[in-house]
Amino acid sequence: MNKQTQTMQIYQVIFQRGDYVSVETYKEFEYATEQYEGIVKIWKSKPNECEFIKERHEREFGYFRVAEFTNGVKVTIKTDTLRELKNRIKG
């Protein structure tokens, strides 16, 4: 396999607006009132990077983005900037 080839794992995730999501356990969602399904792509070749993998979703209550954190494998939505998102995810 070529070293430059990127391996990818894809997870199906159900997440609630504003919540932190663990794609490894899929927990924290039994109380959700608004749920959305999304695809989370985990790029093994980028262990410390975070990038947005889904475009914004316009709803009656605002704009949302999905981000992947390959180091911690966590996802959140309802944030305007990557900086804000990084500040919210700690450890």
Question: For each predicted feature, which ranges?
Answer:
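Short, mixed-charge low-complexity intrinsically disordered segments
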Residues: 2, 38-91
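Short aromatic-glycine-(Arg/Gly/Cys) micro-motifs in beta-strand/loop hairpins
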Residues: 2-22
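A short, exposed loop/beta-hairpin motif centered on an aromatic-Gly-Thr core
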Residues: 18-33
